[in-house]
Amino acid sequence: MEQKIRQNGNAEFSMTISTSRELWRYLFRGQKNSSEKLTRVEAFHDLIERQYAALQQENDCIFGSISSLSRAWHWDRDTTSAFITDLEKFGAVSRYDIGKRAVLKLNCTIG
């Protein structure tokens, strides 16, 4: 476990929590978003579902575009792109582009 020391002298730890698709489905059960615009948590859950669907079709990756994700989440392209970039920084997704198409892969353990 990585330990960092804050300015006030208290230790700050980096923590990684493994979750499952079933846990995410449980957490969202009964939740209704009052607007069409998804929250970041809902968008991440959507990526989990897209990754699961891709794996069922024997694909390792989610194929699409920032525009298609923007439309699905009711976000603008800049916000969507920044969100994916942030997820990359956290190590949650890997991304590469083929032309205008984004290829995303959740960094997950399959079992």
Question: Where are each of the predicted segments found?
Answer:
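Short recognition helix of helix-turn-helix/winged-helix DNA-binding domains
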Residues: 1-68
